[in-house]
Amino acid sequence: MSGGLDILSLKEDDITKMLVATTHLGSENVNFQMEQYVYKRRADGVNIINLGKTWEKLQLAARAIVAIDNASDVFVISSRPIGQRAVLKFAKYTDTTPIAGRFTPGAFTNQIQPAFREPRLLVVTDPNTDHQPIMEASYVNIPVIAFTNTDSPLRYIDIAIPCNNKSAHSIGLMWWLLAREVLRLRGTISRSVEWPVVVDLFFYRDPEEAEKEEAAAKELLPPPKIEEAVDHPVEETTNWADEVAAETVGGVEDWNEDTVKTSWGSDGQF
């Protein structure tokens, strides 16, 4: 799929990320249509996925997404909790439409209901849990891209990206790689420059574990310092109210004592 171009080939750094996230580890069962993507089978029965074919299908899926003129017509879906955060982040950076959580039955086929949508392309996290949108897409001829494990059914799926879709880190990494490839094909970011968005943002975090981590971080913090009260010398101030009151009392004359008796008569008598 890379056409022999080194710039499109799978880099060592990406291979390391996939191995750390256990993207290459499939399930113990194999669907007959997924046998072509299995590299070998381990002694414990776990099937190893060929990461070279995973990368080729990832590039093919990115080209299909870029071919859609209006990015909002591409719907990215995840019913499983481990893929919901990755779907929301993917939609944020690629301007696609996310459906995280329960899918409303009839959203693609029932034109009466308010939630009716007409997408041009679907990208689902798991064909087993997202079977309802895949089935409805087959009724209205909507192409489907899916992250598939070794035991995933490929019915009604047009582009299958083989990977470990049962691991939170693996599925988060695959959505991150797909988002990066889409942005590169659009010309938003360069292939020679590292994408500044870290893959950790696409990983699912259990709310209970997140609360425990926050509580543990608070316990490691040093106790807050209590500042001791400092006694500052109080300056002696005079009470201006007393001074004003004293001046007022001393300066007021008694008008009753100096009352001048006058008479209306000429002799001065009343």
Swiss-Prot record:
Comp. bias regions, Polar residues: 261-270
Intracellular or extracellular location(s): Cytoplasm; Nucleus
Cytoplasm as UniProt keyword: yes
InterPro entries associated with the record: Ribosomal_uS2, Ribosomal_uS2_C, Ribosomal_uS2_CS, Ribosomal_uS2_euk, Ribosomal_uS2_euk/arc, Ribosomal_uS2_flav_dom_sf
Annotated GO biological process: ribosomal small subunit assembly; translation
GO molecular function: ribosome binding; structural constituent of ribosome
Keywords: Cytoplasm, Developmental protein, Nucleus, Ribonucleoprotein, Ribosomal protein
Region described as Disordered: spans on this chain: 251-270
SUPFAM superfamilies (UniProt xref): Ribosomal protein S2
One GO CC term, this protein: nucleus
One Pfam assignment: 40S_SA_C
Record-annotated membrane-spanning stretches: none
Tree of life domain: Eukaryota
Known function: Required for the assembly and/or stability of the 40S ribosomal subunit. Required for the processing of the 20S rRNA-precursor to mature 18S rRNA in a late step of the maturation of 40S ribosomal subunits. Required during oogenesis and imaginal development.
PANTHER family in the record: 40S RIBOSOMAL PROTEIN SA
NCBIfam families the UniProt entry points to: uS2_euk_arch
Family: Belongs to the universal ribosomal protein uS2 family.
Protein name: Small ribosomal subunit protein uS2
